[in-house]
Amino acid sequence: MQALNSISSLQTSASLFPVSLNSDVSANTSTSSKELKAVIDQLVQALTQSGQLDETSPLGKMLAKAMAADGKSANSIDDITASLDKLIHEKLGDNFGASAGIGAGGGGGGIGGAGSGSGVGGGLSSDAGAGQSDLMSQVLNGLGKAVLDDLLTPSGEGGTTFSSDDMPTLEKVAQFMDDNKAQFPTRDGGSWMNELKEDNGLDAQETAQFRSALDVIGQQLGQQQGDASGVTSGGGLGSPVSDSSLGNPAIDANTGPAANGNASVDVGQLIGQLIDRGLQSVSSGGGLGTPVDNSTQPTGGTPAANPTGNVSNQDLGQLLSGLLQRGLEATLQDAGNTGADLQSSAAQVAAQLINALLQGTNNQTNQAVA
C-alpha cells in the first residue's frame, strides 16, 4: 500500500502545473506538437520570476547551464522557451511529444480534465483508468531523470565530483541510501549524508554505490514516464538496473551487495549460510522440526535400527537437504521483501524529486509570503 501511495503521488505531481492550450507565453516555432508547446509554456511560467529565469530550482539550474552554453539570455522569455524546448528534446528524444494527443476522459473543458469540467488542476492528464498519455507527467519525470544523470561529474581513477549547488537533490539521494543501508553500505559504517559533507568528491567505490542508488530512483522515474505514455513493457527513461548493480537478491538478503564484489563465491560458506538460515526459519516457524533422536524410539529388534541412538547418515542427509531448501526459500522471501521495500522507498524519493523540480528559493519565498 505504501508503494501504491508513493506511485500515486508521482502521478499527481503533474497536477500542480495545470496547462492551458490557449497560453500565449511565446510564439515558439519549434516542431513540437501543440500539446507539448502548451506544457513548455506552463513550465516557463513556473520557472521565471518577473520575466527572468529563476536559477535556484533544480530544473532552473540545468536550463541556465544549457542556455549559457548556447549563448542565450536568461532575461528573454523567447530564449527561455526555445531553450527549454531544445532541452526536452535533447533529454527525452528528438521525436518526443511530436504527436501527443488530447486525453478524451474527464470533464468537458481544458485538456483531459479530471471530471471537473474546468480544465484546471488536471494538467495534461487523461483518463487514468484508460492509461492514456499524460504529457506533463512524462516531461517532469524525464527531466527529473536528467537532473539525476547530471549530478556526478567524472574525475580521475573512476571517482566523481559534485557541486554544492546540487546539495538539496544529493541529500535526498543520500538519505535514501542511509534508509537502505543493507543495499548501500559505507566502508566505515558511517552515513552517506556525512559523506557528502566531507568534501565534494567520491572515490570509485563510493561512486559505484551512489550511481547504483541513482539507477534505482531513475528506474522509478522511467517507470512512471512509461505508465503515463501507456507503455507497460518497462524501460522508459529509467536506466535498466543491471544484476551487477543490485547484486544477487538470494545472497544480498543475508550478506549484502558487497558480497557480489568477489567473483569467486565460497560455495561452502554459501551452503553454511543457507543451512543457518534454514535453522532460523525452522526454529521460528516449525517446518522441519527438531531432528529425531533414535534413542527415544523403539528399536523393535530389527537390524535396521540404530543401536547407538544417533541419527543415521541417511537421516542426516535428508535433514541437511531439508534445511538447505528451507534456507533458500526463506532467503528468497527475505530478498523479495527487501526488494519491495527498496522500490517503495525509491518511489517516495522520486516523488520528492519531481515535487522539488521547479521549487526554487524565489518561489518558495513567495509561497511563504502568500
Swiss-Prot record:
Residues 221-257, 282-314 are annotated as: Disordered. Disulfide bonds: none annotated. InterPro entries: HrpN/Z, T3SS_HrpZ. One of its GO terms (biological process) is symbiont-mediated perturbation of host programmed cell death. Changing residue 265 to A: In strain: ICMP 2844. Residues 235-291 are annotated as: 2 X 7 AA repeats of G-G-G-L-G-[ST]-P. GO terms for cellular component: extracellular region; host cell plasma membrane; membrane. Residues 221-231, 292-313 have a biased composition (Polar residues). The keyword Membrane applies. It is found in: Secreted; Host cell membrane. Keywords: Host cell membrane, Host membrane, Hypersensitive response elicitation, Ion channel, Ion transport, Membrane, Repeat, Secreted, Transport, Virulence. Sequence repeats lie at residues 235-240, 286-291. The keyword Transport applies. Its main location: secreted. NCBIfam families: T3SSHrpZ (NF045569). Belongs to the harpin HrpZ family. Homomultimeric. The glycine-rich region is characteristic of harpins. Harpins are proteins able to elicit hypersensitive response (HR) in non-host plants and are required for pathogenicity in host plants. HrpZ forms ion-conducting pores permeable for cations. Such pore-forming activity may allow nutrient release and/or delivery of virulence factors during bacterial colonization of host plants. This is Harpin HrpZ. The gene is hrpZ.
